[in-house]
């Protein structure tokens, strides 16, 4: 109810900016009980009455992808055809509380332009906690609804564009300063991003272009406490320490003029002659990762990762993928043709033909490994001294939009161990029910005065 009041107050345009930021600080309580996989989403438009009251936005509520689509559909179908997506690297609802003008202290607010835009917008919507999966597919969803490919723009490019109110346009604006945010204070990063938002909106206002804008982030900037600590576990034991959540590293991205290949894994380990090494920290989140040899086109892609020294030599891993059109399904499908490991002039080949899916999707699998206990998706024709295991593996080499994966085609089969267990349990219970019903229907009532073996009893009527 609290968050619904916030959204309603902003939407009608009667609430002032200080009230909005004070309300956002209260909504931050809802995000405190969520996990680290939620980010806020702020929407506003130059048209009126695009969003109905949000009845489900209460403390602790997390907006799913299906609920988000119900909020976005009216704006995309009835609102302006020009959509702006401001995408930050990190953002959490707590940032609005910590760095916004919550109590009227507007001179210290890091969101002055955003605050002004929401205050003047005829329609606006604030969702404090949106599921990370819904945000990761937001660009693809907007592209499908608008029927327009996303266009990565900056301030210089935006001034040269001639936007038309009748033609759909999806403008993706990656806010700057994110690459060097580790060297800057959070307030400076947010202030710089807010200035970019203000300049973009000023450009659209000068051209009198109707628009719908959205501000969100790739991942949260703050790790929220677990719900058990907030709701029911406030009493801590003596000498108890809070376990730190593992950091979520960004995917490896190969770029030429734009991001072309995305690769991610929760754990990336290789073994040479049964000596295992973890390459996760050497691969993800590393600025100087050696991608020499990688290339991409519409039908063929190769991601090349080089490490030196590794096992005393220079080792290169090559993920080779191809995209082909299949008339039967009338769509393009991609497949990873092979995985190569180059070292000391020798090459080890792994067949990974099961890594496949529609080209508009990414591929995800819990384990892609040469170890038989973990699925054995990496197959070699001859015995090899190399072994590899990728945990929570995900890759996309075609139709990449920004640095976010599209919907994932998962490797999980239908008859998984859990499904088999459920089916067998259901069949067993059904057998017991059928047998019991059969026994009940087979019951016959016995007349204790009826003796089928003896003579029939006859009664003579005496008058």
Curated annotation (Swiss-Prot):
Disulfide bonds join 365-411. Residues 1-32 form the signal peptide. GO terms for cellular component: clathrin-coated vesicle membrane; endoplasmic reticulum membrane; endoplasmic reticulum-Golgi intermediate compartment membrane; endosome membrane; synaptic vesicle membrane. The gene is Atp6ap1. This is V-type proton ATPase subunit S1. The keyword Transmembrane helix applies. It is found in: Endoplasmic reticulum membrane; Endoplasmic reticulum-Golgi intermediate compartment membrane; Cytoplasmic vesicle, Secretory vesicle, Synaptic vesicle membrane; Cytoplasmic vesicle, Clathrin-coated vesicle membrane. Residues 33-225 form a propeptide. Residues 33-412 are lumenal. The record marks 225-226 as: Cleavage. Keywords: Cytoplasmic vesicle, Disulfide bond, Endoplasmic reticulum, Glycoprotein, Hydrogen ion transport, Ion transport, Membrane, Signal, Synapse, Transmembrane, Transmembrane helix, Transport. InterPro entries: Ac45_acc_su, VAS1/VOA1_TM, VAS1_LD. Residues 434-463 are cytoplasmic. Gene3D superfamilies: 2.40.160.110. Expressed in brain cortex (at protein level). Highly expressed in islets of Langerhans. Expressed in pancreatic acini, pituitary gland, adrenal gland, lung, brain and bone marrow. The chain crosses the membrane at residues 413-433. GO terms for molecular function: ATPase activator activity; small GTPase binding; transporter activator activity. It is a single-pass type I membrane protein. Its main location: endoplasmic reticulum. Accessory component of the multisubunit proton-transporting vacuolar (V)-ATPase protein pump. Interacts (via N-terminus) with ATP6AP2 (via N-terminus). Interacts with RNASEK. Interacts with TMEM106B (via C-terminus). The keyword Membrane applies. Glycans are attached at residues 164, 255, 267, 290, 297, 344, 351, 399. N-glycosylated. It holds the Pfam family VAS1_LD. Accessory subunit of the proton-transporting vacuolar (V)-ATPase protein pump, which is required for luminal acidification of secretory vesicles. Guides the V-type ATPase into specialized subcellular compartments, such as neuroendocrine regulated secretory vesicles or the ruffled border of the osteoclast, thereby regulating its activity. Involved in membrane trafficking and Ca(2+)-dependent membrane fusion. May play a role in the assembly of the V-type ATPase complex. It comes from Mus musculus.
């Amino acid at each position: 109810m609290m968050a619904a009041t916030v959204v309603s107050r902003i939407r009608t345009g009667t609430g002032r900016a200080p009230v909005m930021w004070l309300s956002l600080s209260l909504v931050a309580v809802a995000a405190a009980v969520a996990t680290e996989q939620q980010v806020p989403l702020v929407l506003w438009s130059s048209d009126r009455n695009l969003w109905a009251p949000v009845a489900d936005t209460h403390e602790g509520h997390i907006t799913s992808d299906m609920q988000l689509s119900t909020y976005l559909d009216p704006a995309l179908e009835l609102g302006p055809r020009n959509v702006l997506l401001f995408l930050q690297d990190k953002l959490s609802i707590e940032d609005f509380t910590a760095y916004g003008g919550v109590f009227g202290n507007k001179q210290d607010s890091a969101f002055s332009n955003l605050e002004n835009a929401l205050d003047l917008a005829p329609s606006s919507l604030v969702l404090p906690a949106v599921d990370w999966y819904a945000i990761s597919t937001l660009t693809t969803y907007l592209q499908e609804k608008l029927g327009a490919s996303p266009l990565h723009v900056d301030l210089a490019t935006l001034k040269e564009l001639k936007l038309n109110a009748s033609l759909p346009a999806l403008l993706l604006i990656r806010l700057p300063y994110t690459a060097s945010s580790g060297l800057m204070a959070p307030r400076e990063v947010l202030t710089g991003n807010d200035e970019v938002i203000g300049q973009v909106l000023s450009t659209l206002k000068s051209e009198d272009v109707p628009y719908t804008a959205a501000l969100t982030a790739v991942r949260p900037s703050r790790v929220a406490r677990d719900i058990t600590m907030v709701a029911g576990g406030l009493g801590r034991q003596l000498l108890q320490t809070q376990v730190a959540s593992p950091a979520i590293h960004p995917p490896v991205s190969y770029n030429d003029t734009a991001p072309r290949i995305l690769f991610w894994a929760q754990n990336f380990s290789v073994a040479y002659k049964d000596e295992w090494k973890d390459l996760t920290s050497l691969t993800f989140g590393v600025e100087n990762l050696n991608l020499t040899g990688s290339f991409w086109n519409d039908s063929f892609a190769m991601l090349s990762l080089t490490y030196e020294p590794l096992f005393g030599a220079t080792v290169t891993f090559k993920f080779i993928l191809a995209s082909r059109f299949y008339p039967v399904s009338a769509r393009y499908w991609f497949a990873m043709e092979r995985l190569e490991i180059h070292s000391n002039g020798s090459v080890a080949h792994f067949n990974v033909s099961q890594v496949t899916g529609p080209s508009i999707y990414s591929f995800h699998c819990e384990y892609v490994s040469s170890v038989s206990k973990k699925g054995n998706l990496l197959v070699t024709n001859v015995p090899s001294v190399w072994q590899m295991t990728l945990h929570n593996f995900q890759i996309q080499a075609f139709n990449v939009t920004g640095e976010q994966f599209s919907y994932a085609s998962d490797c999980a089969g239908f008859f998984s161990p859990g499904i088999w267990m459920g089916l067998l349990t259901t069949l067993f219970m059904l057998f017991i029910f059928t047998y019991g019903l059969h026994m009940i229907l087979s019951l016959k009532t016995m007349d204790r005065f009826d003796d089928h073996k003896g003579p029939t009893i006859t009664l003579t009527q005496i008058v």
